[in-house]
Curated annotation (Swiss-Prot):
Subunit structure: Part of the 30S ribosomal subunit. Contacts proteins S3 and S10.
Presence of keyword tRNA-binding: no
UniProt-recorded name of the protein: Small ribosomal subunit protein uS14
Gene name as annotated: rpsN
Naturally occurring in which organism (per UniProt): Aeromonas salmonicida (strain A449)
A cellular component annotation (GO) from this entry: cytoplasm
Matching NCBIfam families: PRK08881.1 (NF006477)
Alphabetical UniProt keywords: Ribonucleoprotein, Ribosomal protein, RNA-binding, rRNA-binding
Length: 101
């Protein structure tokens, strides 16, 4: 199991990403826009750098909803491979069954 502090840190990052999402997209649009003046684009770059580091979506890590495990994460279920297998064997995931060929 992941430490509670790691789970809390990821939750904090998710909040920051949601909070600054619109501002980040606006600034990135200005930076990419070739019709904008060089000064406006440069100001947008500087403003983007001033935003909190954890407000970037690439800083987030997918974690298992039950254990907080960062590796072996399956997006479809929101769980790690270990927990998916456990729940599948108990029949708790509808439509999922063990492969046999």
């Amino acid at each position: 199991m992941a430490k509670t502090s790691m789970k809390a840190r990821e939750a904090k990052r998710a909040k920051l990403v949601a909070k600054f999402a619109t501002k980040r997209t606006e600034l990135k649009a200005i930076i990419v826009d070739m019709n904008a003046s060089e000064e406006a684009r440069w100001d947008a770059v500087l403003q983007l750098q001033q935003l909190p580091r954890d407000s970037s979506p690439s800083r987030q890590r997918n974690r298992c909803n039950i254990t907080g495990r960062p590796h072996g994460f399956l997006r479809k279920f929101g769980l790690s491979r270990i927990k998916v297998r456990e729940h599948a064997m108990k029949g708790e995931i509808p439509g999922l069954k063990k492969a046999s060929w």
